């Protein structure tokens, strides 16, 4: 995979109003999709899904021009996610935000300046490992049933003495 600069992945993010860059995101013009013998090779934004020890899986957003590819489930993980997240920006001054998707986390960072990670699913709030050094956690959730689930899971899992949690 190559850096995002001047790639369809960068154009995809920019089409969504996302101008920030993260070293966790890359682009590959020929990303395999499908089983052996029926594999297609498509352009994709590639995201490292990481723990403290480093990457353990990847997340692929398949693209068509500067949009998500038009087929069922154009966003797919490869590998077991466990407690990992797409760590777009490192926590700073004890602050970290969690959002469901990469685009939401990037947008939250752009709007608030709070470093954010993508959990890769509302159901994964509470599963993602948050560093003990985080004293101010922001849960950037959608305002729907999935977001309510994410908020309740996050509040239950991440509460501890010395940590403030904000649902946004």
Protein language model features and the residues they cover:
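Short, aromatic/basic amphipathic alpha-helical patches
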Residues: 149-161
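A structural preference for short, hydrophobic beta-strand core positions in alpha/beta folds
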Residues: 118, 166-167
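A residue-level signal for conserved active-site and pocket-lining positions in enzyme catalytic cores
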Residues: 13, 108, 139
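Phosphate-handling DNA/RNA-contact segment within nucleic-acid enzymes
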Residues: 34-136
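Acidic, metal-coordinating catalytic cores used for nucleic-acid/nucleotide bond scission
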Residues: 124-126, 141-151
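Acidic beta-strand-to-loop metal/phosphate-binding motif
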Residues: 98, 135-146, 168
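TOPRIM metal-binding catalytic domain and adjacent DNA-binding surface shared by DnaG-type primases
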Residues: 1-45, 50-52
